[in-house]
Amino acid sequence: TYTGNTNRYNGVVESQDSYEVNVDSSRTIKEILVKVGDEVEEGQTLVTYDTSELEMQVKQAKLELEGIQNEIDSSKKKIATLTDELNRTTDEDDKFSLTTDIQSEENSIEENKLDLESKNLEISKYEDQIDASSVVSKKSGVVKEINENGTDRNGNNAAFMTILQAGEYR
């Protein structure tokens, strides 16, 4: 009878590669869609952000956009009225005053056009953030750790989630 030696080793077998998933700390997490031990596929949604505040900001910005457009329309009507008056008057003082008023309204329109452009960019920024309201897995693997508070045991910054890649082990 053969009573050979059997080699036994202590340790942990884990994937050679792991990657860290970070979240935007300035945003509120709505839902974590996975838990430790879950297998995840590349492209799978792991976390979703709460977008309700961003949606409210978009609505508010669109209302402000409408207000700015109304100011532009009002200035255009004033210019039309002032131009009619300018064409009818013969008094030089009135012509000067009306011309100044027209230029003032034209300047107001230009300022409001810049405000429109700025507000449209703001809306685009909010909409881009709403579109990017989830964090997806970049690789397939298994969720090793979820760290909701963003720090490790020693209080140092740590990844929100660690995923062990499927594949070779060590």
Where are these regions (language model features)?
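Residue-level signal for the solvent-exposed faces of long alpha-helical coiled-coils
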Residues: 28, 53, 57-60, 64-67, ...
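Short beta-strand-turn/beta-hairpin segments enriched in glycine/proline and small hydrophobics
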Residues: 4-29, 121-138, 162-165, 170
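Surface-exposed patches in structured soluble domains
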Residues: 12, 31-33, 39-45, 136-170
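Short charge-dense sequence patches
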Residues: 10-13, 93-97, 105-109, 133-139
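Long, amphipathic coiled-coil "stalk"/hairpin helices in large membrane-associated assemblies
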Residues: 6-60
